[in-house]
Amino acid sequence: TAGYEDEPSHTVTTVIVPHNAKSGQLVNYLAYIDSNGAQCAPSYSMRQGSKFLNDDLLNYQQLLFSTFLNEGWILTIPDYQGPQRAFAAGRLEGRMSLDGIRAALNFGEIGLEKNTSVVTYGYSGGAIASGWTAALQASYAPEINAIGFAMGGTPANVTSTVQSLDKGVFSGLCVAGITGIIYAYQVVQDWFQNHLYPKGNDAIEYARSHCITDIFSRYPFSHVFSDDFFRNGSSILYDPTIQSVISDIVLGLKESETPKAPVYMFHSQHDEIVPFSDARKTSHNWAKHGADVFFQEFSDLPIGHALSEITNIPNSLFFVRDRFAGKPFPKGYTRKVTGNGLEEPNASLAGLGELVRAIQDIQGREVGPADSELKQFILDRN
């Protein structure tokens, strides 16, 4: 694959072929890694035989992962952060994702044809990769038969995302995001060498060797953008050197980076981790530039960032099913507001009862209203 400046690079993608595999259908599954430790990448955590992503906080990803496999879809699961473990470096992640698809299509033992239909899915940090896969596919990998892109809880603007997280219970994501950008861009790495205080340097080093649960638990309610961590910490995001990089990884700004295949986006209006307004703005920009976008909003107050994906698993499943079935997709821009994903009539279809019960179990036992159980889990570990 290639780095941000077109330098040669490399990464790994893990391909899973279910026993009931359907030929000609590939799902590019972009797990939310949201961290910088090498052991957090899917190829490492899955090879170790651990629970998916080897992280207690993220284990419920297995539910959607298993649902896709049960459909008979072959999955390619790339380590899209690359050897730099560059979390939040969207353009880099998009390239790694697309080259992972190429690798799967070119690996003869899997038996996929070059014109295999591909649908991409990603949530949260995985939606950064999914969004940039959609944005870059037409220019970077036009030969891929991309027929749909799904993404939810999308951090479309890294700057506003980390600003909203600073000093909150999930402020560890600020540390992980900064660390990813530092190691993706040499110019940023050079700049930070002169701006890191000991506490900031310790945080970067910690993030480089840990997964997201540990990072969350070590840095809740931290004022990351402060002089405790960095010289002129409150203004580093506005420094010209940093601005030149982060302003170039805002999804939806360039008309030339408009997805050519249908886009399904979903987001809670009350998302406490990723700003809702940024994702909606990206959806509008893409539609304005000619993309077909279906944007689904969840209005229920208890539906926070984690519950958005969990309760929307049936709709994500239907989107992928419909793309492979060649069903029509609404043209232009479509907005739909529901309380949560399980309110959709199709969620109660025959055959989905067990899935819905599993979702409701996780919703109440592991996540809680407004992600309250997740927040308490982080604080209990601190």
From Swiss-Prot:
Signal peptide: none annotated. GO terms for molecular function: triacylglycerol lipase activity. Its main location: secreted. One of its GO terms (biological process) is lipid catabolic process. GO terms for cellular component: extracellular region. Induction: Constitutively expressed regardless of pH conditions or exposure time. It is found in: Secreted. It catalyses: a triacylglycerol + H2O = a diacylglycerol + a fatty acid + H(+); a monoacylglycerol + H2O = glycerol + a fatty acid + H(+); a diacylglycerol + H2O = a monoacylglycerol + a fatty acid + H(+). Disulfide bonds join C40-C211. The active site is at S124, D271, H305. InterPro entries: AB_hydrolase_fold, Lipase_secreted. It is an enzyme of class 3 (hydrolase). Its EC number is 3.1.1.-, 3.1.1.3. It holds the Pfam family LIP. Glycans are attached at N115, N157, N232, N346. Keywords: Disulfide bond, Glycoprotein, Hydrolase, Lipid degradation, Lipid metabolism, Secreted, Virulence. SUPFAM superfamilies: alpha/beta-Hydrolases (SSF53474). Belongs to the AB hydrolase superfamily. Lipase family. Class Lip subfamily. Secreted lipase that hydrolyzes acylglycerol lipids such as triacylglycerols and consequently releases free fatty acid. Can hydrolyze 4-nitrophenyl palmitate to release 4-nitrophenol and palmitoic acid. Due to an absence of fatty acid synthase genes in Malassezia species, secretory lipases are essential for the yeast to generate free fatty acids from degradation of sebum and assimilate them as lipid sources for growth. Plays important roles not only in lipid metabolism but also in the immune response of host cells and pathogenesis. This is Secreted triacylglycerol lipase LIP5. The lineage of its organism: Eukaryota, Fungi, Dikarya, Basidiomycota, Ustilaginomycotina.
